[in-house]
Amino acid sequence: MAVIFVMATTVAASAQDEPEYKLEIGAGTGLVSYVGDYNSNLLKGMKPWLVLMGKYRMDPRTALSLNIGTGKIKTKEFNHRITEADLRLEYNFWAYGTGNEYRGAKRFTPFITAGLGATFYGGPEKGATMNLPIGAGVKYKIGNRLNLTAEWAMRFTMSDKLDGSKDPLGIKSSGLFKNTDCYSALQIGLTYDLWEKCKTCYQE
């Protein structure tokens, strides 16, 4: 019994000593597709997508995520590159972590994300527009400092020129997103934890 007690005490102490981290940095890849005047199918014309990401963990359930992505959107009518930068809020349905640094945290959790960004597009009507990314995904902590994520997010833009043409079909509509182009990205990413949290900074 004494041996079991000593082992349990040692495991508990090592769990409490496991560091927490505030920051994640990493990269991902996936597929991007355009929805607009020349395409209404999310799964049609998907092209390679690359993304760099950084996340600041505010607590085990929420994080701020900065993303920079690039890829091509293409149909038979056009072939343009888009590059985006956005800032999002991520909300985890369950507290996220190894369960050692934060009691009750889980290695796996689904999450939702939304934010605000900018999209830069090429072509004859090249320019920039705001985008509103909204999506969902899952994340899994595959190691003490390694995180695997999979997510899908739709970007609602305020431009009808991502495809190089403004309202070529003469569609009548009104409102903030009047006949604007959108695009979505399905991606997987790998991030690494940095910036160890000080556990004694607020202790007397």
Regions found by a protein language model. Give the residues of each.
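Outer-membrane beta-barrel strand-turn architecture
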Residues: 19, 56-60, 93-95, 120, ...
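Residues that define the transmembrane beta-barrel architecture of outer-membrane proteins
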Residues: 21, 44-48, 81-85, 106-108, ...
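Outer-membrane beta-barrel translocator domains and adjoining extracellular loop/strand segments
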Residues: 37-42, 75-79, 101-103, 123-128, ...
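Glycine- and aromatic-enriched membrane insertion/assembly motifs of diderm outer-membrane
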Residues: 40-92, 155, 168-173, 187
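Predominantly the C-terminal beta-signal and adjacent terminal strand-loop region
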Residues: 73, 82, 142-204
